[in-house]
């Protein structure tokens, strides 16, 4: 797949949550996923630990199972006080935008399994029972890599 003719600023300024515009019928070649993962692995890592790993799931049954877990997590999140749908904006247009965000995120929770591939960012080890700061540090360590994966996909014309 050819890279789009985009500057770094273009990629950063045009990478959005495109949940309702994802083309679930568009196949994604393994080589393209590998390129995006290779780019993502160049991301910074706390203490240079490099504990991030990526799991690519293309099997339909496994994608379905992951989609079900995502739906369950979405249901839990949607009952929390910090849920995007619980946030009330001041202006009418701002509230309409917030409602669209919630609508598109709900859509993704219902269609996660429809993606031709799921790429899961993981980190080595577990944080069960660890202090909050350690948990946040370990889990946050994968975020630069996941963002880099999203930017690499965007540079190749793919949504994430």
Label each PLM-derived region with a short phrase.
Residues 1-37, 49-50, 58:
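Specificity-determining recognition surfaces
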Residues 40:
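Covalent nucleotidyltransferase
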Residues 43-49:
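Glycine-rich phosphate/pyrophosphate-binding beta-alpha loops
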Residues 49-52, 155:
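Short secondary-structure junction motifs
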Residues 56-142:
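Glycine/small-residue-rich phosphate/adenosyl-binding loop
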Residues 111, 151-152:
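Hydrophobic/aromatic ligand-binding patch that stacks against planar heteroaromatic rings
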Residues 131, 153-160:
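Short conserved catalytic/interaction loops centered on acidic-Pro-aromatic/His motifs
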Residues 141-144, 148-151:
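Short amphipathic alpha-helical face segments that pack within enzyme cores
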